[in-house]
């Protein structure tokens, strides 16, 4: 199969992965309306072409939280990344490090903090949920700090897990799930050998380190289901500040009032996000939510955005709508599943090239030049 775009990596991942894993990363909540709108709303934003501007000195470099990024992209936290390639978190982190951008390790990663951090040169970011087990949260924060993690990404849009119906159909959950996953793996020998056998242990490294025992996929579903905390409030973030003195980014903001609260709390950044359409179906796409949030808090904290970003043009669109940096989730996991760490490196290089084309033809010589002037007026007003 010839890979020439991010969509090609998705197709290659679908061929290589057992269905339960492909649909886990590919699917969303309920009828997946928001999942679809995330991609569609971005693709419908028209860029404003400008020419004859001498774009020979174009630069993608930017700064965020005192870090220099080669382009305004970071890899998002994605649970179970280590099930998509052998020691997948390590491979993805190394690809991000090579490109000069941050990698964010999920709370529910296969590879623990202590395995990923030493594999890269730049400090990684760490993502944390609010869970009932505050002992685990404190333990994770202390370990992240000890490993040199520079930025905490605190996910707040998951007080309860979303209803992901695709998971029940695919075998990730539902009746006879373990047997269905086993049978699917038999018909995907490359994955079964490379990841299923050689990628062991398949436990949740960060949780296993705390519990002192292996935690497999069934434990993952059960432990998370019993530990999400619907009582989450701003007081929980104050508690976290007692154990984390570095930059804190609040992930899961879709409303300007919540963004203003994040400023009052003293957050260093927010992620405008609907969890990739995996939590509450029917909410606005991140692209539609972003402009009002940027109007409310731009300049008061860093604005990151995710959900629906599949290529370099989408990155430019999000920046034009008000984001300082974007997080890339599904897209890098597709590339990882299809071609390992090299696939992630190739995808990041492709996004780099796509951004350069878009910036050249919109007249933006630097990241700071990307704003609403890069968008067609009618579309800009329509958002």
From Swiss-Prot:
Catalytic reactions on record: (S)-lactate + A = pyruvate + AH2
Cofactor: FMN
Pfam families registered for this protein in UniProt: FMN_dh
Keywords linked to the UniProt accession: Cell inner membrane, Cell membrane, Flavoprotein, FMN, Membrane, Oxidoreductase
Ligand binding (substrate): 24, 129, 164, 278
E.C. code: 1.1.-.-
Membrane topology category: Peripheral membrane protein
GO molecular function, a single term: FMN binding
Active site: 275 (proton acceptor)
GO-annotated cellular components: plasma membrane
BP term (GO), one: aerobic respiration
Domain of life: Bacteria
Stretches assigned to the FMN hydroxy acid dehydrogenase domain: 1-380
Localization (cell): Cell inner membrane
Keyword Cell inner membrane in annotation: yes
Disulfide bonds: none
PANTHER family linked to this entry: L-LACTATE DEHYDROGENASE (PTHR10578:SF85), S -2-HYDROXY-ACID OXIDASE-RELATED (PTHR10578)
NCBIfam families per record: L_lactate_LldD, PRK11197.1
Function: Catalyzes the conversion of L-lactate to pyruvate. Is coupled to the respiratory chain.
Family label: Belongs to the FMN-dependent alpha-hydroxy acid dehydrogenase family.
Protein name as catalogued: L-lactate dehydrogenase
Gene: lldD
């Amino acid at each position: 199969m010839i890979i020439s775009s991010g969509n090609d990596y998705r197709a290659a991942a679908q061929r290589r992965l057992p269905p339960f894993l492909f649909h886990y990363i590919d699917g969303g909540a309920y009828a997946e309306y928001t999942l679809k709108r995330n991609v569609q709303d971005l693709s419908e934003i028209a860029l404003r072409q400008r020419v004859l501007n001498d774009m020979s000195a174009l630069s993608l470099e930017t700064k965020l939280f005192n870090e220099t990024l080669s382009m305004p992209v970071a890899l998002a936290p994605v649970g179970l990344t280590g099930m998509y390639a052998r020691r997948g978190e390590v491979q993805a982190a190394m690809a991000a490090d090579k490109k000069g951008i941050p990698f964010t390790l999920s709370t529910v990663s296969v590879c623990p903090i202590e395995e990923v951090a030493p594999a890269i040169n730049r400090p990684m970011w760490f993502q944390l949920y609010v869970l009932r087990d505050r002992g685990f949260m404190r333990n994770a924060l202390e370990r992240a700090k000890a490993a040199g993690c520079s930025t905490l990404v605190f996910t707040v849009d998951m007080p309860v897990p979303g209803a992901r119906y695709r998971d029940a159909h695919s075998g990730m959950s539902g009746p006879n799930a373990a047997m269905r996953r086993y049978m699917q793996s038999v018909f995907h020998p490359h994955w079964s050998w490379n990841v299923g056998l050689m990628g062991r242990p398949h436990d949740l490294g960060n949780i296993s380190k705390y519990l002192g025992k292996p935690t497999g996929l069934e434990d993952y579903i059960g432990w998370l289901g019993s530990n999400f905390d619907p009582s989450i409030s701003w007081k929980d973030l104050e508690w976290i500040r007692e154990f984390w003195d570095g930059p804190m980014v609040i992930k899961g903001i879709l409303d300007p009032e919540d963004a203003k609260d994040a400023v009052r709390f003293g957050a260093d950044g927010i992620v405008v996000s609907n969890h990739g359409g995996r939590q509450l179906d029917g909410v606005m796409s991140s692209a539609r939510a972003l402009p009002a949030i940027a109007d409310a808090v731009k300049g008061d904290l860093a604005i990151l955005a995710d959900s629906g970003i599949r290529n370099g043009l989408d990155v430019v669109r999000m920046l034009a709508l008000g984001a300082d940096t974007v997080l890339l989730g599904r897209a890098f996991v597709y590339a990882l599943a299809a071609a390992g760490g090299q696939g992630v490196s190739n995808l990041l290089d492709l996004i780099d090239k796509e951004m350069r084309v878009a910036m050249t033809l919109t007249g933006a010589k630097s990241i700071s030049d990307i704003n609403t002037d890069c968008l067609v007026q009618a579309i800009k007003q329509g958002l």
